[in-house]
Amino acid sequence: MTSLQYKNIRHNLAGDYPHIDPTALIDPSAQIIGNVRIDKDVFIGPLAVIRADQRGKDGKVAPIQIDREVIIQDGVIIHADPGASVIIGSKTTVAHGAILHGPCTIGQECFIAMRASLYKATLEDHVWLGIGAIAKRVTFHSFTKVPAGAVIRDRPEVLALRLITEKERNYMEEVWAANSRLRTDYLELREKAESIRSAAKKDG
C-alpha cells in the first residue's frame, strides 16, 4: 500500500504509515493516518477516523493498535495525546460515533455502544460501555456494565456498577458476529468485482 494508491490511508508528519493486514476491510471513506496497526479480520466502517500523529517528547508517535477481529463502526474517532497510545483488544465492537482518546486500553470482547466516549481509561475484558456513556481516568474490571448516559470519573463510581448478565453478554457476541459476517460479505463482493474487472481487461 502507498499513499498514492489509497488517499484515505496515509503517512503522518513523522513519516509513519499504517500497517494493515490484507484480511482487514477498510471502507474507502474511512481515514487511517500514521502509526496505526490493524490486525487480521478487522472491519473499519464508513467515515471512521483513526489518526496516530501526535509526537511525544521523544519525537515519536505512539501506536494505535487494533487487534484481530475488532469491529469499528461508522463515524468512530480514535486519537491520542502526544506520545500516548490506544490499544483495542480482539473481538471488541466499537459502535457508531464512539470516541476513543488515548491514552486508553480496551480489553478483548468489549462492547462500546453508540456515542460513548473514553479518555485516559482502561477497560478489562468483556466490559459494556452503554450508549452515550463517558469514562475518564478510570479502570473498569472485566464483565462490568456501564449504563447508558453514565459519567464515570472515579473509583467509587466504578465500584457502584453491576456486572453484565448472561443475556447482555450474548447480545455483545451477537452484535460482533453480525458485523463480522458483514466484513466477510463485503470482502466477497469486492473480490467478485475485481475478478469481473480483470476479466473485462483481458477481453478488451
Where in this protein do the model-derived segments appear?
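Glycine-rich hexapeptide-repeat left-handed beta-helix
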Residues: 2-19, 47, 51-53, 57-65, ...
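Conserved short histidine dyad/triad with adjacent acidic residue
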Residues: 21, 26
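Beta-strand-rich extracellular passenger or scaffold domains
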Residues: 27, 32-33, 51
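Short, T/G/N/S-enriched strand-turn elements that build extracellular solenoid repeat scaffolds
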Residues: 35-39, 140
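Beta-solenoid repeat scaffold
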Residues: 38-40, 67-68
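Glycine/small-residue-rich phosphate/adenosyl-binding loop
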Residues: 71
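Core nucleotidyl-transferase/polymerase catalytic module
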Residues: 91
